[in-house]
Amino acid sequence: MEMKYFELVKSGTTHDFIKYRRVAIIGSVIVNLLVLFGATVWPRLNYGVDFAGGTELQIHFNKTVEAGEVRDEVSKLGFGEPTVQRYGNEAENQFLVRVERIALLTQEKADLVKADIQQAMPTMTGMRFDPEVGDKLDFTFKQPIDEGTLRSLVEKAGTPVKEVRALSGREGQDREYTVITQGPGDKIGGALRAKYGPDAAEVVRTDYVGPQVGKQLRTDGILAVLYAMGMILIYVGFRFDFRFSPGVIIALIHDAIITLGFFVVTRHEFNLTSVTVILTVVGYSVNDTIVVYDRIRENAQRHKGRPLREIVNLSINEMLGRTILTSGATALSLVGLIVMGVGTIQDFALAMLVGIISGTYSTWYIASPMTIWLEEHSEQKRAIDAAKPKPKNQQAAAAR
């Protein structure tokens, strides 16, 4: 009994993908340049607290509140222009609020606190304050002190205190105390509760990232993507031929930029999760491209003598059904996350969906045509070199 299989794309399909390669490449270059302009010049990426530094709060309201109202209220607190965006769906009444400050305590205020406590408590031997860490003061005393007294002295200097922690120390050693002062999150939460009611606003989560740490994370994110592409370049070069590698890398750069464009257009936060999305898209895209390259290699051996252009087009058509089914199945699972997910999960799924579509497109219209161009370019170069007149000494040697 003959088995019949479902075929999404009928065998023998001969759609000419290579015919439109110039239009596709020109269109891709234009879109990529627009995305890069948008990411770096205007309107620029909406960096999350991971990269921009500052304080980010997730705030839940038990009644309907507009983002503009929250923004206006936070703006009154003197943190500069805050970023306020809805988190999840509208019914959840949750917002992400980001300000550039990570601490209310400045170096000047810390010096003032140190001077006041030094005067009131001569047993103090030192105080440490790091603006990158945030609202924390570390004190050292020759002998144990009353924590309540330390709290009142710090507050008397104009710095509200959340907590005083005594660190354990051995007898005869200096005693250390850590004073945790109120930060931007406390001030914002207090202002919103004063505006909407004591139980109306709840700070669900607060994240702090210093500006130097944010820059380092941004650099590390870029390096992670570059390292991944470099390893893929080496892998493709060894598995196939180094003529295939440039096409893969250009396609991956294209996919990474298109995924970046999702964050530029939607104004969703670009953070460490976004870098994870780009790395995932790069991995998914190269898998799709390698499947087509495998078929190109097989067909090149099977159809020796045929132009590479025809072999590439044949290979894409033969793998068309597999590509559509694989990408479609992944896209369906992402649609479920988009519909049911919220916040970061939803952003991840949306960006992945864009990346998968871009990866499928780049396999057909970027990576494969680039391989053809490199082959044609090398053939032209060989023909030009062969047509050049040989030096007389080489002609004489050939005559012998």
Where are these regions (language model features)?
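A structural signal for conserved, well-ordered secondary-structure elements
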Residues: 1-400
